[in-house]
Amino acid sequence: MGRIIGIDLGTTNSCVAVLDGDKPRVIENAEGERTTASVVAYTQDGETLVGQPAKRQAVTNPENTLYAIKRLIGRRFEDEEVQRDLKIMPFKIVKADNGDAWVEAKGQKMAAPQVSAEILKKMKKTAEDFLGEEVTAAVITVPAYFNDAQRQATKDAGRIAGLEVKRIINEPTAAALAYGLDKKGGDRTIAVYDLGGGTFDISIIEIDEVEGEKTFEVLSTNGDTHLGGEDFDNRLINYLVEEFKKEQGMDLRNDPLAMQRLKEAAEKAKIELSSAQQTDVNLPYITADATGPKHMNIKVTRAKLESLVEDLVQRSLEPLKVALSDAGLSVSEITDIIVVGGQTRMPMVQAKVAEFFGKEPRKDVNPDEAVAVGAAVQAGVLAGDVKDVLLLDVTPLSLGIETMGGVMTKLIEKNTTIPTKANQVFSTAEDNQSAVTIHVLQGERKQSSYNKSLGQFNLEGIQAAARGMPQIEVTFDLDADGILHVSAKDKSTGKEQKITIQSSSGLSEEDIEKMVQEAEANKESDKKFEELVTARNQADQLIHGTRKQVEEAGEALPAEDKEKIEAAVSELEEARKAEDKEAIDAKVQALVAASQKLMEIAQQQAQAQQAPGGEGEQEAKQDDNVVDAEFEEVKDEKK
């Protein structure tokens, strides 16, 4: 079996790690960074950029640069959160035929898992470059509070990227694994506060150690899948837009280019204000009107930023209370607090968390890397490389079916350890009813319509009988990824229907297969593009080298050969402008053939240089008379 890698697929940044010996190691990408921006761009010349290269060109290509896609994964277009994002994202969010929230770039509609797959492909390639072998399996992390549809969509993204997703693991649980793996000395109860780019989770986890074997048991989890650093950025962006409007009377929201520049500046200002008390948002030529160009120069203090986001930080504290209550613990029973996710670097967030728990969060956990490291540990457990670690995770939300009167009847309660199985016997609501619809729900409300619909299916062929007589056994089987499999069986006839819940929205098997094939086709076209670029570079080098040699050969090169070479160079220059690698290769060979005489002359000249008494030797003799001197640099006092 090949290596299994651990991937933290984040809203703002992603990270990949692998077990290197018995220690997890975060792998640097091609740009030398330990994290990769979760940004995907589709350029005018058909290239797909991921990470920093995509981020760099965002200002000039805002409509086709996609970021924070994780906020859309597994979501319906009509969802309130999607409608909020619709107003602030510079790219198009569109409604798919199945009701999902998709995106549009360069006139093409794409599912969120398709875009996320591009980020996963980059992570896969990063790992392959480091390991020197193909990688086909991964453990991918998701927010603990992700529902079934969002987990399924993340798995789909993995498949599209060419990865077998061995396990979906909750981010706070992964962070706890990273933290607790090498900690010695007794049992601990830890709180993992995870405020990332787009999602927020809190998990209460108990770490027990018995005879060297560690058990990580999640006691409870809670969160908000639409609260994160992006929301903090948006508050600052809105403030800057309003301030500029007051000063200049112009609304920048109508200018996608200006908004993209503003997004970058706001993110930078927010980061700076974690260490400084004040910063300037200085954007010259942000826009223009009939009177000329307009510039933005607005001072932002840390206090101002804190006043803009105070309610968001406060919002993150509510799930803490619920999680503690669900775990049956008081604040004083928490031994350690771990904060992960980039947004936890904000001093105000750290202060509020410390105030809530009555103690400072630990500083020995890297908030950007802990989740990927934990995923790599779990990958090691699955591969059999890490022994003595048992992970017991939970389902974040209750699961059940709709019963008479639009009530949700729960079969699996929230915070139940997974994998788990539950069954319950139901019956018909009317006489001689021959079919029942099983409507599967996820959530905590009694009224079905307020919960998340995960899908429905029919059990047909029920024997005619008075209402309440048939016995229909519904079984919920929740796997270790937190993905649900449901079956319904008529106990009298033995007829059975089974489904793996694939939200009525989610991607069908056909869709995924098509996207996998597209990704494979793109792999081929990417390879061809790379080969074309290599051929062009070789052509450039040959042209440059040949011209230099022609110059050096001077009169020694017959005029007839010189003409042949110049013609071949011109033809190669023309060929390299086109998209045909074979044509470039052919013209390279033609230039090499035309340069035979030139090569001979160059060789003769080189030999003459090396010969005794030649120029090279004379220079060497002169060099013998050179005396090495030591110089001391004199500093200019005025500087």
Curated annotation (Swiss-Prot):
Signal peptide: none annotated. Residues 603-612 have a biased composition (Low complexity). Induction: By stress conditions e.g. heat shock. Residues 625-639 have a biased composition (Acidic residues). PROSITE patterns: HSP70_1, HSP70_2, HSP70_3. It holds the Pfam family HSP70. The modification Phosphothreonine is found at T199. Keywords: ATP-binding, Chaperone, Nucleotide-binding, Phosphoprotein, Stress response. One of its GO terms (molecular function) is ATP binding. Gene3D superfamilies: 1.20.1270.10, 3.30.420.40, Actin, Chain A, domain 4, Substrate Binding Domain Of DNAk, Chain A, domain 1. CDD domains: ASKHA_NBD_HSP70_DnaK-like. It comes from the Bacteria. Residues 603-639 are annotated as: Disordered. InterPro entries: ATPase_NBD (IPR043129), Chaperone_DnaK (IPR012725), Heat_shock_70_CS (IPR018181), HSP70_C_sf (IPR029048), HSP70_peptide-bd_sf (IPR029047), Hsp_70_fam (IPR013126). Acts as a chaperone. PANTHER family: HEAT SHOCK PROTEIN 70KDA. Belongs to the heat shock protein 70 family. NCBIfam families: PRK00290.1, PRK05183.1, prok_dnaK. This is Chaperone protein DnaK 1.
